[in-house]
Amino acid sequence: MVFFPHRHLIGIKGLTEQDITYLLDKADEAVKISRQREKKTSTLRGLTQINLFFEASTRTQASFELAGKRLGADVMNMSVGNSSVKKGETLIDTAMTLNAMRPDVLVIRHSSAGAAALLAQKVSCSVVNAGDGQHEHPTQALLDALTIRRAKGKLSRIIVAICGDVLHSRVARSNILLLNAMGARVRVVAPATLLPSGIAEMGVEVFHSMQEGLKDADVVMMLRLQRERMSGAFVPSVREYYHFYGLDAETLKAAKEDTLVMHPGPMNRGVEIASEVADGPQSVIAEQVEMGVAVRMAVMETLLVSQNQGPRTDGMKA
């Protein structure tokens, strides 16, 4: 039997191909549960999950909540807007307070990179990173991988083009790490101003043209233009950005006929993607949302149940 040797899920970095495959296989089982009429199980009955979101979220928070509830856990959503954080309490103080309540897992989203890793050092329960600044978003990468694997039957040797605001995207970073670990060919397509320095050292091919970057791609993953994280003029205008880097039906023709169109959400229609593509036959955006619940069920079960059946480490380095 294969064991998952980690107490926390802080990032994709630190996971092996075997770890990733284990979680994806678990998630496949969770998909079956989610498609049943009776979706609730007793797997995590008696265990407590606290969702601690310091950044606004709709999909991710709802997905984690639903995952916990479908496994039978007691789930609490902590509203940061009404919490002691607004009164000046630090993240560490909040962590220590919550830890004293003896939860079994904390799910955290925070605007600062490294927040999840810091939390994991201060609490005695498992920690799941739901996105920390521009660092990582591991469950998003896992759900994207599950979506691709279920549609294509594999992850190795497929060509994935990640397009758009790579610079500010924790989703891009986690996907690059995961896809490389699983043997995929990864391309990034973006203007130079929206690419981090040293991106080529992450094992990706860099393109500045959508036509060139999408050629023969099996998967096209569009990223949102994250204007809320921008402090300067990274693009001349939204209109010009869409002209050169937006995905419409004509641009999509450069990819394979059976290419998958993906987007982590929320989408900016008419900015990075056209409605005709987002709602078109090649889009698997709705499937990504469904796979998100399954992946988070798999992560929760693995950290809180499966890991107790074998040796584990104290966590992963972010």
From Swiss-Prot:
NCBIfam families in the cross-refs: asp_carb_tr, PRK00856.1
Pathways per UniProt: Pyrimidine metabolism; UMP biosynthesis via de novo pathway; (S)-dihydroorotate from bicarbonate: step 2/3
Designated name of the protein: Aspartate carbamoyltransferase catalytic subunit
Coiled-coil positions: none
A single BP term in Gene Ontology: 'de novo' pyrimidine nucleobase biosynthetic process
Keywords for the protein's UniProt record, in alphabetical order: Pyrimidine biosynthesis, Transferase
GO cellular component: cytosol
Gene: pyrB
InterPro entries: Asp/Orn_carbamoyltranf_P-bd, Asp/Orn_carbamoylTrfase, Asp/Orn_carbamoylTrfase_sf, Asp_carbamoyltransf, Asp_carbamoyltransf_Asp/Orn-bd
Pfam family, one: OTCace
One example GO MF annotation: aspartate carbamoyltransferase activity
Similarity comment: Belongs to the aspartate/ornithine carbamoyltransferase superfamily. ATCase family.
General function of this protein: Catalyzes the condensation of carbamoyl phosphate and aspartate to form carbamoyl aspartate and inorganic phosphate, the committed step in the de novo pyrimidine nucleotide biosynthesis pathway.
